[in-house]
């Protein structure tokens, strides 16, 4: 199984992962402060 990712696909994946991490962090902070 070989997966060839182009630079734009890798960049998009990193942006999506970072966005999800930020949302999860904000959610955990809001729950912690509640």
UniProtKB/Swiss-Prot annotation:
Pfam families: PsaM. InterPro entries: PSI_PsaM (IPR010010). It is found in: Cellular thylakoid membrane. Signal peptide: none annotated. Keywords: Membrane, Photosynthesis, Photosystem I, Thylakoid, Transmembrane, Transmembrane helix. Disulfide bonds: none annotated. Belongs to the PsaM family. HAMAP family: PSI_PsaM. This is Photosystem I reaction center subunit XII. The gene is psaM.
